[in-house]
Amino acid sequence: MLRVFIFFVFLGSGLAGKVKSPITCKYFISKNNTWYKYNVTILNDTIILPAYNTIPTNATGISCTCHDIDYLQKNNISIRYNTSILKTFQDIRIIRCGMKNISEIAAGFSKELKFLDLRYNDLQFIEYNILRKLIRSNTPTYLYYNNLMCGKRNCPLYYFLLKQEQTYLKLLPQFFLRRISFSNNHTYLYHFLSCGNKPGHEFLEYQTKFCRTKFPEINITVNQLIAKKNTERYKNCYPFVLVSIICSCISSLFLLICLLRTICKKYSCTKQGKTTHSYIPLIPSYTFSLKKHRHPETAVVEDHASTANSPIVYIPTTEEKKVSCSRRK
């Protein structure tokens, strides 16, 4: 008996561990303008909502949120909607978890959604044709994507963007574009899902066309959008650019100083050579001594090393001058 008791205890604890936490949903009553909560259970690892007996017939909208997203992802629990009941609502507010393809939510819908929340999904891209079926083109629509609310009540523009572009949604929350990349020529195509009541204006990057709506404050060109992106992209490089400019200025100043120094040095050396070195001796200096000779003009020159630096000077005496003059006579 003890073994049987222990067996049932372990069995009960194991079953209790598999009990799934409920998912909280709400339905909206437009008469009271109030949301009412109700719980939905998990059946065969699938959440089926809403149930026919849990939502009153006068409800005009539903909203279902993930109670524990981590729990759903770890246990591979998916959400399946009863699309037949969803068709009757005018304001459908849906939050999906773990969705990787928007076609999962688009299947079975016969009317356009007025509210769509895609924050808790791993969507790499959203197909344009499917999204156009889910949102209304002539009435304001809220669209949540990557934790950013994209939509305004006073702006009938709708968009979806690639997941990596979520940063730029903060810059232009009222301007909704789709960006498609072409791998061939690295060109980007911006597609306006709705411009006022006109569907689909397409522009290539760097073109100056723009989509003007009936709201004057929403008027922006594709070039302005690209300029905002480039500003955000290169904002972190500004300090490095400043440092490089300062270094180039310092190097230019150093080269200019060296050039001026070389020119000044050359100019000062030339001037000094003209003033102090006007006489450059080509032969060594000698001291002359006159020996007695019959012709003083042909006197022999003797070198005296002791007075080698004396100048070349020869001054005849008075007697020699007289002798020379008398001989000439």
Swiss-Prot record:
Sugar-modified residues: 32, 39, 44, 58, 76, 82, 101, 185, 219
Induction: Expressed in the late phase of the viral replicative cycle.
Extracellular side: 32-239
GO cellular component, one term: host cell Golgi membrane
Residues annotated as signal peptide: 1-31
Post-translational modification: Highly glycosylated.
Coiled coil stretches, renumbered: none
SUPFAM superfamilies: L domain-like
Location relative to the cell: Host endoplasmic reticulum membrane; Host Golgi apparatus membrane
Chaperone keyword on record: no
Ranges that cross the membrane: 240-260
UniProt keyword list: Glycoprotein, Host endoplasmic reticulum, Host Golgi apparatus, Host membrane, Late protein, Membrane, Signal, Transmembrane, Transmembrane helix
Membrane topology according to the record: Single-pass type I membrane protein
Principal localisation: host cell
Cytoplasmic side of membrane: 261-329
Gene3D superfamilies per UniProt: Ribonuclease Inhibitor
Highest taxon listed in the record's lineage: Viruses
Keyword Repeat found: no
InterPro entries tied to this protein: LRR_dom_sf
Domain-related comment: Contains putative leucine-rich repeats (LRR) and a C-terminus cysteine-rich capping motif similar to domain structure of host TLR3.
Family, similarity comment: Belongs to the asfivirus I329L family.
Described purpose of this protein according to its UniProt entry: Viral TLR3 homolog that probably prevents TLR3 dimerization and subsequent induction of IFN. Inhibits dsRNA-stimulated activation of NF-kB and IRF3.
Record-given protein name: Transmembrane protein I329L
